[in-house]
């Protein structure tokens, strides 16, 4: 099984968590693209979706799935998204695709977070994948200095502007032993919109595509 086939298997397995006639929270990224394809096969059974990025919105609309503004929705039964890394406590690093802020907002609204990954994303300790931090542009240098004080090596992601008009600093060389604490510390820096640690709102269900099929882990 190729890595992409494992992503696809995990994505399709998430369909069973989608409630009939519901509005589904949809994340961003290569694994989620497979989930959107899967969602397209049952679009008659759902009301529509709330999307965490312009890219996912475009793909949903292309398949004829109605996309709602989050402000017009009271609740989401599920939010389905991938991760760049996930540990055994269901804490994640997300934001490789620069959609972390909207992903975090949609995840906060959902009753259940379903994380879909291939088996290369499972780690014992978070931090091998650089931690994305979304920053107001004028605060970039200040935030970078503060991240250095926390032990990180921030690198400006050249040429990337988020859907919110902000910039991304990718923080390298961090062994993240206390994800909840670090998430709060970074979010406390003036000029930070949010960071890619999803520890305060981790995953409820993890679906992992493996060569032997899909493994299910629950929090």
UniProtKB/Swiss-Prot annotation:
Associated pathway: Carbohydrate degradation; pentose phosphate pathway; D-ribose 5-phosphate from D-ribulose 5-phosphate (non-oxidative stage): step 1/1
Catalytic activity: aldehydo-D-ribose 5-phosphate = D-ribulose 5-phosphate
InterPro entries linked: NagB/RpiA_transferase-like, Ribose5P_isomerase_typA_subgr, Ribose5P_isomerase_type_A
GO biological process terms, semicolon-separated: D-ribose metabolic process; pentose-phosphate shunt, non-oxidative branch
EC number per UniProt: 5.3.1.6
GO CC annotation terms, alphabetical: cytosol
Residues that bind substrate: 28-31, 81-84, 94-97, 121
GO molecular-function terms, A-Z: ribose-5-phosphate isomerase activity
Pfam families assigned to the protein according to its UniProt record, in alphabetical order: Rib_5-P_isom_A (PF06026)
Domain of life: Bacteria
Keywords: Isomerase
Catalytic residues, chain numbering: 103
Complexes and interactors: Homodimer.
Function text: Catalyzes the reversible conversion of ribose-5-phosphate to ribulose 5-phosphate.
HAMAP family, sorted: Rib_5P_isom_A (MF_00170)
Family (UniProt): Belongs to the ribose 5-phosphate isomerase family.
Protein's UniProt name: Ribose-5-phosphate isomerase A
Gene giving rise to this polypeptide: rpiA
């Amino acid at each position: 099984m190729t890595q992409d086939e494992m992503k696809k298997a995990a994505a399709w397995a998430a369909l069973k968590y989608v409630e009939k006639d519901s509005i589904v929270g949809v994340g961003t990224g290569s694994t989620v693209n497979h989930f959107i394809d899967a969602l397209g096969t049952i679009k008659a059974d759902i009301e529509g979706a709330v999307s965490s990025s312009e890219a996912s919105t475009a793909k949903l609309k292309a398949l004829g799935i109605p996309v709602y503004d989050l402000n017009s929705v009271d609740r989401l039964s599920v939010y389905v998204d991938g991760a760049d890394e996930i540990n055994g406590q269901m804490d994640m690093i997300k934001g490789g695709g620069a959609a972390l802020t909207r992903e975090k907002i949609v995840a906060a609204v959902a009753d259940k977070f379903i994380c879909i990954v291939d088996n290369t994303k499972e780690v014992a300790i978070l931090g091998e994948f650089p931690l994305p931090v979304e920053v107001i542009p004028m605060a970039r240098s200040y935030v970078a200095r503060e991240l250095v004080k926390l032990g990180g090596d921030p690198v400006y992601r050249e040429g990337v502007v988020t859907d919110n008009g902000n910039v991304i600093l990718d923080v390298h060389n961090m062994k993240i032993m206390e994800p909840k604490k670090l998430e709060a510390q970074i979010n406390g820096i003036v000029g930070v919109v949010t960071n890619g640690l999803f520890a305060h709102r981790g995953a409820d269900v993890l679906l992992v595509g493996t060569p032997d099929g899909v493994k299910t882990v629950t929090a």
